[in-house]
Amino acid sequence: MKFGNFLLTYQPPELSQTEVMKRLVNLGKASEGCGFDTVWLLEHHFTEFGLLGNPYVAAAHLLGATETLNVGTAAIVLPTAHPVRQAEDVNLLDQMSKGRFRFGICRGLYDKDFRVFGTDMDNSRALMDCWYDLMKEGFNEGYIAADNEHIKFPKIQLNPSAYTQGGAPVYVVAESASTTEWAAERGLPMILSWIINTHEKKAQLDLYNEVATEHGYDVTKIDHCLSYITSVDHDSNRAKDICRNFLGHWYDSYVNATKIFDDSDQTKGYDFNKGQWRDFVLKGHKDTNRRIDYSYEINPVGTPEECIAIIQQDIDATGIDNICCGFEANGSEEEIIASMKLFQSDVMPYLKEKQ
């Protein structure tokens, strides 16, 4: 079993941005002592939904502040920045950490990011393909050249070279069937969303396994990750109550930050996300409290026994034994770390790989 901790860097109303950044560093350091293998950092821009615009920089700090902790991105919006610049950043982190960096990537969801950074969102899928292929070439060969409709430059040497053979491990944040297939065609592990239930996770893995097998990959050796919103307390109601205020503000901030729901009909390739939002509305999840209640049904929020049951059900259904939890909804920094420690002592030891 492996365990990760993802850090949202959401700015709740009661915290300043300086306090959020300080908490990010403290929680990252605390994760190493609480039995977590990896900390995952999210990329967001221009909104309190997430203050971390450059996870590479934050990863460098946390890798330097810890000794054994892996630090990953969940995820870099790959199409919005130059692939060579990003490949240099990844290799630098891989070298300086001696292989402790994890490179999580995604295609991107927010129209605002593409507009500000000057990337055509309609081309996001093609750019994702192109950028990844170029970066993979650089990681493997030490050189990159490009001559296609998206980018042109002569052969250059990628410095520094990768520390890890083939480059830092790559993960894909995957929600849609098309992204699942994209990852499977390349044998890349997925980070599965915390907003889907066990049945949906199993269906996503079945699709992945079918496509990956067709492309010659051994699916038993692919290190997928399950993600969760997590709160552990010996009092189940207290665990849920302490999270509700944070999650309410966080969900509302997400809706406000996301342009795709109200003006993305002209954007190609995002039908899954628009359909997902329609499903949320039909289920009543547009109402924040109902959405939080549903989140509690499918995420480990409650007593240690309740948390174990929810996670173990997903492990048994999917075979995934890499568990990534987010604890920031638990209140103050002290309360967050207390929940992390209780997860370490009363949940981690009792989770078992699928038999």
UniProtKB/Swiss-Prot annotation:
GO cellular component, one term: cytosol
Keyword Thylakoid part of the UniProt annotation: no
Catalytic reaction equation(s): a long-chain fatty aldehyde + FMNH2 + O2 = a long-chain fatty acid + hnu + FMN + H2O + 2 H(+)
A Gene Ontology BP annotation from the UniProt entry: bioluminescence
Source domain of life: Bacteria
Any one Pfam family match given in the protein's UniProt record, by short name: Bac_luciferase
Alphabetical list of InterPro entries matching this protein: Alkanal_monooxygenase, Bact_Lucif_Oxidored, Bacterial_luciferase_CS, Luciferase-like_dom, Luciferase-like_sf, Luciferase_bac/NFP
Keywords per UniProt: Flavoprotein, FMN, Luminescence, Monooxygenase, Oxidoreductase, Photoprotein
Known EC number: 1.14.14.3
Subunit structure: Heterodimer of an alpha and a beta chain.
Function: Light-emitting reaction in luminous bacteria.
Protein name: Alkanal monooxygenase alpha chain
Note from the entry: The synthesis of this protein is regulated by a complex control mechanism that has been termed autoinduction. In fully induced cells luciferase comprises up to 5% of the soluble protein.
Gene name for this UniProt entry: luxA
A GO MF term: alkanal monooxygenase (FMN-linked) activity
Family: Belongs to the bacterial luciferase oxidoreductase family.
